[in-house]
């Protein structure tokens, strides 16, 4: 996180990549494989990256690219309490099932609100939702949407087909990128929940089942020279009036990390609102607006309106 003027401040960050830990966050931002576009000068704030638990967070392609830190692991709960962290954001590599749940439990033990940006089902899992409800701590999740990304545009176009009376027969979404997220996703065994999350996010906007063979959505390949850019190729094939074929195909080009950052900041703000209001459990409206796999799926228009009502205090969650 960047230190900002609106009250969002850096706290301790945990990490496992190559650079020697602890390291100042402002230096870690450009270390090793971090290759996004620079859009701001970030002053040194004294915030350091500390050595967290790895568990299943370090996949095959990470091991081939960077060395895991040899620094001793910190007591995550103790560090969260010492830094007086109010909201913990989970932004681990795709496939970090065990690690994501470890940090979710750390949030509960440290008394933090939790924002789950990963396609690991926590907010949308009843057992975990009940844990946060019992602890009186809010959670926003699961699996962050980008500001304008492949999933949000694909959802809207699928819904547009249905709203305009065009029967969607089949669709695909192919994504390529050059950051470590895409390199990590070459390990297909880590993608099960990611594919489920992205697919269900799109198909949830339809009131009929396309069938598994007619939907293909997921990361496709790693192209190193793209750096932090992501290119998405989306196609929708349908039938309009008189069963006449109607097809739509488009390409989306974005810088992946900033496209996500603007959304995660608002998710953090909503989590803090929930914490201030002493709301425990999943925040349904912000989760549906900011996440691909929320506990409850609304249309994007409904989710936006409900989130505004939540912020204004007109809706509990």
Each language-model region and where it sits:
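Active-site-lining helix/loop region of Rossmann-like oxidoreductase modules
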Residues: 148-280, 284
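Short, ordered loop/turn segments at secondary-structure junctions
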Residues: 93-94, 112, 119-120, 144-145
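Rossmann-fold NAD(P)-binding glycine/threonine-rich loop
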Residues: 94-106, 118-137
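A structured beta-alpha segment of the ubiquitous adenosine-cofactor-binding alpha/beta core
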Residues: 17, 22-89, 93-98
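Rossmann-fold dehydrogenase core element
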Residues: 131-144, 165, 169
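NAD(P)-dependent Rossmann-like dehydrogenase/reductase catalytic/cofactor-binding core
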Residues: 261-317
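Single conserved hydrophobic/aromatic residue that forms the stacking wall/gate
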Residues: 1-19
